[in-house]
């Protein structure tokens, strides 16, 4: 039987694991047992990798994704079309768009979405950083690439209102993406079609 002190350490591991997406108390307990019983060396590597990432990975100064250095590789690429800016929910969405090879412009990563049930309001989607990003004047079209979920639709609505009186053409991905579908799980072909057939929300101009 574990001593009280050791039990506290084990419970601390479980509590730490529960911060991961879709990991509840039972799943966290199973992962903790597995790491301690079978994967101690791998767990040490995980700790080292996490500590290194926390020290070296920051937000890109332009698009707000994660990167090592001031700018991510995409923002630093001068061959990208800076006139089109795709606004996405999270860094994984950028990776999926790049894999689909359907957007040669730049990105802005919101790092969140509106979810009133969880108390996540407009402050969750980095509108202030997005406004700063648009200050350069090169952008002509904003492509809203949020998912067709309740949260994604709410976020898209707030974004469209934000851009309403600004001089940008605004469009959103077509609904070829399944209703309720996150971009992370959409295949490359469907994703590309949704970009090419994107729906116009407003024309550019003041």
Swiss-Prot record:
Membership in a protein family: Belongs to the RecR family.
Biological process, per Gene Ontology: double-strand break repair; recombinational repair
What this protein is called in its record is: Recombination protein RecR
Q: Which gene encodes it?
A: recR
Q: Recorded GO terms, molecular function?
A: DNA binding; zinc ion binding
Sum up the protein's function in the record's words: May play a role in DNA repair. It seems to be involved in an RecBC-independent recombinational process of DNA repair. It may act with RecF and RecO.
Positions of C4-type zinc fingers: 60-75
- Organism, by scientific name, is Neisseria meningitidis serogroup B (strain ATCC BAA-335 / MC58)
Toprim domain residues are 83-178
Keyword annotations for this protein, in alphabetical order, are:
DNA damage, DNA recombination, DNA repair, Metal-binding, Zinc, Zinc-finger
Q: Which SUPFAM superfamilies match?
A: Recombination protein RecR
């Amino acid at each position: 039987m574990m001593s009280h002190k050791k039990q506290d350490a084990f419970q601390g591991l479980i509590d730490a694991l529960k911060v991961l997406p879709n990991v509840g108390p039972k799943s966290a307990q199973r992962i903790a047992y597995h790491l301690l019983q079978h994967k101690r060396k791998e767990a040490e590597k995980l700790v080292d990798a996490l500590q290194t990432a926390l020290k070296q990975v920051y937000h890109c100064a332009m698009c707000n994704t994660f990167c090592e250095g001031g700018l991510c590789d995409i923002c630093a690429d001068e061959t990208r079309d800076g006139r089109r800016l795709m606004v996405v929910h999270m860094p994984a969405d950028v990776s999926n768009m790049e894999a689909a090879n359907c957007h040669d412009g730049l990105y802005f990563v919101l790092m969140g979405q509106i979810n009133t049930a969880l108390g996540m309001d407009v402050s969750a989607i980095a509108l202030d950083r997005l406004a700063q990003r648009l200050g350069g004047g090169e952008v002509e079209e904003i492509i809203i690439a949020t998912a067709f979920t309740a949260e994604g639709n709410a976020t898209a609505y707030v974004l469209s209102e934000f851009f309403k009186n600004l001089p940008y053409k605004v469009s959103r991905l077509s609904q070829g993406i399944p209703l309720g579908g996150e971009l992370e799980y959409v295949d490359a072909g469907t994703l590309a079609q949704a970009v090419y057939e994107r729906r116009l929300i407003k024309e550019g101009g003041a």
